[in-house]
C-alpha cells in the first residue's frame, strides 16, 4: 500500500515509521512516499499531513501547487490524517488564541473550527491521556497544540479535554475519510495510523 506523507515541514520521518509499523500490525506492506509536489500524490491510498507551523505549511503548499492537489485528492476519497498544524490545515475555520482570525491558506476540507495555540506556545507542551471512542485510551503528546471547538455537517468531535479558558474542547475529529488530531500520535502510538490504513482498506 502506497501512503504519502506531506513533506513540507514537520516530523515526516516519525509519520513514515508509524505507518510502516501500523502496516506490519495489520498485515499490510506499506510503502511511504514523501509528498513534495503534486505528482507525488499519484496512486497513494492514504495521506498524512504532519505538524509544523500551519501558516508556513499553507504558504508552501500554495507555492508548490500542493494546496489544490491535496484538496482534490482528499475530496476524491483518499483517507487523510492531519496532526497538530496538519489538522489546522484541514479545518474550514481557523482562529488564533491570541490574534483571532488568521486568514492563512488552508485546505478547508473538514467541517471543524480550530483554535491555534489554544494551550499556549512551546513551553506549555504537555502529555495527557485521551479517549477516542473507537480506539480506547491513548497517551497523547501536545506541542503548541490547537483545540477543536466546533463541528458541523458530518464531522464529529472526539477526545474531550477540559481547557482553563475555553471550557470543554476536543483533541480529535473525524469526518468521512478524514481524521484530525491536536496531538502527535506518531510519537506514542500506531493506533491512529492503523485507523487510517483500515480506512484505506475499507474496514471503517
Swiss-Prot record:
InterPro entries: Class_I_gatase-like, PdxT/SNO, PdxT/SNO_CS. It comes from the Archaea. L-glutamine binds at residues 52-54, 116, 143-144. Pathway: Cofactor biosynthesis; pyridoxal 5'-phosphate biosynthesis. Keywords: Glutamine amidotransferase, Hydrolase, Lyase, Pyridoxal phosphate. The active site is at residues 84, 184, 186. One of its GO terms (cellular component) is cytosol. One of its GO terms (molecular function) is glutaminase activity. It catalyses: aldehydo-D-ribose 5-phosphate + D-glyceraldehyde 3-phosphate + L-glutamine = pyridoxal 5'-phosphate + L-glutamate + phosphate + 3 H2O + H(+); L-glutamine + H2O = L-glutamate + NH4(+). Belongs to the glutaminase PdxT/SNO family. HAMAP family: PdxT. Catalyzes the hydrolysis of glutamine to glutamate and ammonia as part of the biosynthesis of pyridoxal 5'-phosphate. The resulting ammonia molecule is channeled to the active site of PdxS. In the presence of PdxS, forms a dodecamer of heterodimers. Only shows activity in the heterodimer. PANTHER family: PYRIDOXAL 5'-PHOSPHATE SYNTHASE SUBUNIT SNO (PTHR31559), PYRIDOXAL 5'-PHOSPHATE SYNTHASE SUBUNIT SNO1-RELATED (PTHR31559:SF0). This is Pyridoxal 5'-phosphate synthase subunit PdxT. It comes from Pyrobaculum aerophilum (strain ATCC 51768 / DSM 7523 / JCM 9630 / CIP 104966 / NBRC 100827 / IM2). The lineage of its organism: Archaea, Thermoproteota, Thermoprotei, Thermoproteales, Thermoproteaceae. The gene is pdxT.
Amino acid at each position: 500500500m502506497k501512503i504519502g506523507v506531506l513533506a513540507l515541514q514537520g516530523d515526516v520521518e516519525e509519520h513514515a515509521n508509524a505507518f510502516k509499523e501500523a502496516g506490519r500490525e495489520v498485515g499490510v506492506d506499506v510503502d511511504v512516499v514523501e509528498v513534495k509536489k503534486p505528482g507525488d500524490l499519484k496512486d497513494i491510498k492514504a495521506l498524512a499531513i504532519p505538524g509544523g507551523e500551519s501558516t508556513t505549511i499553507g504558504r508552501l503548499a500554495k507555492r508548490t501547487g500542493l494546496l489544490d492537489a491535496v484538496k482534490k485528492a482528499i475530496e476524491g476519497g483518499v483517507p487523510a490524517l492531519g496532526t497538530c498544524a496538519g489538522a489546522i490545515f484541514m479545518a474550514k475555520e481557523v482562529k488564533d488564541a491570541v490574534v483571532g482570525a488568521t486568514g492563512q491558506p488552508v485546505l478547508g476540507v473538514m467541517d471543524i473550527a480550530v483554535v491555534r495555540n489554544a494551550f499556549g506556545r512551546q513551553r506549555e507542551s504537555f502529555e495527557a491521556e485521551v479517549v477516542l471512542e473507537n480506539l480506547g485510551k491513548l497517551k497523547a503528546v501536545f506541542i503548541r497544540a490547537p483545540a477543536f471547538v466546533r463541528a458541523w455537517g458530518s464531522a464529529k468531535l472526539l477526545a474531550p479535554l477540559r481547557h482553563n479558558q475555553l471550557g470543554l474542547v476536543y483533541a480529535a475529529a473525524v469526518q468521512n475519510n478524514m481524521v484530525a488530531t491536536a496531538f502527535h500520535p506518531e510519537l506514542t502510538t500506531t493506533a491512529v495510523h492503523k485507523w487510517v490504513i483500515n480506512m484505506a482498506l475499507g474496514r471503517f
